[in-house]
Amino acid sequence: MSGSSFLFLKSIKCILSSSCHGQNTISNTQLAAQYISKPQKQLCETVLKYFDRQYSEELGEQWWNARDVLLNPLSWQYGVLLNRFSDLTNLKQCLAELGYTNLLQQTHPESHSQTADIPLQCFIHPDPVRIPTQSHHTGWLKQYYLLNAASLLPVLALNVQEGENVLDLCAAPGGKSLAILQTATPGLLHCNEVDQHRHDWLLKTLESYVPPSLRHLLSVTLQDGRSIGTMQPGAYDKVLVDAPCSNDRSWLYTPDTHRGEMWLKERTQLPLLQKELLCSALAAVRPGGIVVYSTCTMSRAENQSVVEEVLASYPGVELQELEQQFIDSLSDHFCFAHLHPSVGQLVIPQKGKTWGPMYVSQLKKIY
């Protein structure tokens, strides 16, 4: 058995022994089968060739380094976002003993950036170790949520404070809504999703992690996010637009060539949808409020170009530079791309820092 497989099984034994009072218990034989026999992802050559043409032009050498990581799923790292509303007895100690460290506390402790004092805890490992997800059980709160740690950047950029009214415009499957609740207790967290299946998934996620005593703070809706700004103008202090995008990791492993070709054709329509969602978010936020726009693609057309076009057409909005301390405090673990134009921040996967892609841009509504 390889060292990574041994570490995986050791971590499972440790974590699940203290989980859910036995509800998630599973034999080591089953776990080994789950880990070793997991089918390999099937690469879509059509999408890869398209990405090679586009990203080699937009990102240069940075693309070829990211490409090596994206083509090797066994190298991908996974973050463990802890649920502060659950019983975490022994869990943090177990993770620490296995070599996990807290992403937001392990580097630059002298920094006074906005990450310094928030209760959010995400543990990461230097190796591509992945513990299994926990099963959903009615009435029991899960202890952790597995995610690409770079997906926390939009939530950190949003910088939610106690009692603020927050809108997560495209919320499913719910990881960023959950992360928001780990940073502060909002006065209201409105989680919206337009797709019925993903809306149901969102509901299940919230039920699995949020205690009944706090669910009155949540509003979960099934609406077209493009209409919310008109329906609720100026209603929110902070708005997150984690926009539908050409998810680079997923699209590379599209199940068949025909579907890959279909997605690439649909890709040209995404920037218009993204701009409309961002404009809706700006209408929904109050003057002085913050909107964060994010995607999980490296595409310039879906990232910088969307933000630039909205800034040019929407009066009373300013692009905010993310604090350098904020970037510095995470640079030991995330690789930030050199963007042209320099609008927002983009994390791209690199060897040893396999997090991303994740683009984030922060906007402030002046009036």
Swiss-Prot record:
A Pfam family assignment: Methyltr_RsmB-F
PROSITE patterns on file: SAM_MT_RSMB_NOP (PS51686)
Disulfide bonds: none
EC number of the protein: 2.1.1.-
Active-site residue numbers: C296 (nucleophile)
Catalysed reactions, semicolon-separated: cytidine(34) in mitochondrial tRNA + S-adenosyl-L-methionine = 5-methylcytidine(34) in mitochondrial tRNA + S-adenosyl-L-homocysteine + H(+)
Cellular component, GO annotation: mitochondrial large ribosomal subunit; mitochondrial matrix; mitochondrion
Transmembrane feature ranges: none
Subcellular location per the Swiss-Prot or TrEMBL entry: Mitochondrion matrix
Reported function: Mitochondrial tRNA methyltransferase that mediates methylation of cytosine to 5-methylcytosine (m5C) at position 34 of mt-tRNA(Met). mt-tRNA(Met) methylation at cytosine(34) takes place at the wobble position of the anticodon and initiates the formation of 5-formylcytosine (f(5)c) at this position. mt-tRNA(Met) containing the f(5)c modification at the wobble position enables recognition of the AUA codon in addition to the AUG codon, expanding codon recognition in mitochondrial translation.
Keyword annotations from UniProtKB, A to Z: Methyltransferase, Mitochondrion, RNA-binding, S-adenosyl-L-methionine, Transferase, tRNA-binding
Enzyme class per UniProt: transferase
Protein name: tRNA (cytosine(34)-C(5))-methyltransferase, mitochondrial
Gene that this sequence comes from: nsun3
Record: residues binding S-adenosyl-L-methionine: C170, A171, A172, P173, G174, G175, K176, E193, D224, D242
Protein family according to the UniProt entry: Belongs to the class I-like SAM-binding methyltransferase superfamily. RsmB/NOP family.
Gene Ontology molecular functions: methyltransferase activity; tRNA (cytidine-5-)-methyltransferase activity; tRNA binding
InterPro entries: MeTrfase_RsmB-F_NOP2_cat, MeTrfase_RsmB-F_NOP2_dom, RCMT, SAM-dependent_MTases_sf
Gene Ontology biological process terms in this record: regulation of mitochondrial translation; rRNA methylation; tRNA wobble base cytosine methylation
